[in-house]
Amino acid sequence: MLVQNNKNQCKDNNLLHVSHFVGLSGVGGVQRNFVEYINSRTVLESDSSFFHKIYTLGSVDSQYKLKKEVFDIKRLTNLLSLILDITSRNKIVHFYNNLTSIKVVIFLFLLPVHNLILHERGVIWNLPYFRRPLLLFVIWKARLVLTNSNATKIMLEKKFNITSKKVRVIHNGINTKVKCTKKKLLHDKSSIFHIGFIGRLDTPKGVHVLIEAMRHLVGKNIELVIAGDGILEYFLKKQAKDYKNISFIGRVENPYRFLSSIELLVVPSIREPLGNVCLEAGLCRIPVLAANIDGIPEIIENKVTGELINATDRISIYMPEGAVPLPNFVVNPTNQQLQIPRQINPLLLARKILELSEKPALLEYYAENLHSKVMDYFNIDRFSSELHAVYREINTSKSITHKIDN
């Protein structure tokens, strides 16, 4: 892990101090988005009005090359430092995906909290309703709750009857300076059409549906490459063992290298608060075929930046111990209401993959439109700008409140 600890910034009392508490031991959209933000030019170079300090619990995954020091609160001195930051009137503390944590509830109950931001990115899908009082307490303690999508905000509002004006949407952004060179792939009838999936091999991702779809595509010059690992890996490999058109390559360190080697990304999710992988595909000009569920349509506009398939089938998946449970509800993006989770019909998915494999011009159209959308809106600079505006807003309001109290 690279470490860049700017001691001069610590000494400058004019800087707005922001402490981040985020889990960095796992692999997911929360971690990738945070690392890209904290390593961005806006944070490291351009914007000298902030001092950022990072806290975590446990180890940092080797995939994340952070350019700032990370403080593990398993060490007592670091835990005490975080507590002092939380109780300070002069510092903002930003928690990521901790809205449903019992430990956080206890933590906040015991401490006076002044400038806390909670960033919710999807864990509430599986939060039982009986824990609503705890959720309300945590939101009450916070100055603001940020969500990564309108779908996440809707889940808070519809499932838990949260109508707080504290909830605000800031869509994720990615580093658009990353080089992602798409392979020059052949489109003649004899060439193989490469499709891919990348992500955790767990219940919400719906990979079992994609494998079943490939059963209908045997002999069609279409091959699926699955990148990722997880608790369902053994069972998915068992499901796919008789299909020579499917290969598993395990977890990849560089998702852009993987994306640049395929012609179509398939996202068959059962639950997906936003879908960061769609943004990464867009940067690489890789078209996306995805489930029309939750926050995915906030990135993929059907027939414009990709294609969406409605999830209509009852879910049939083996659930080993330790797998992420299915949520009680997901967000229907068409009517903005909650519905029982469903999966894509495998035969319908197979037909759509086959259809798109025969339309390279259409895929190119989707890819260019998605690329433009990512470059224009879903970029890390826009994300940073909106987030820093929130920090300044809280800093201004806390200064006014402090003067009134005095």
Map each language-model feature to its residues.
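N-terminal strand-loop element at the rim of the active site
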Residues: 2-7, 16-79, 230, 390
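Aromatic "clamp/platform" in nucleotide-sugar-dependent glycosyltransferases that forms part
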Residues: 251, 270
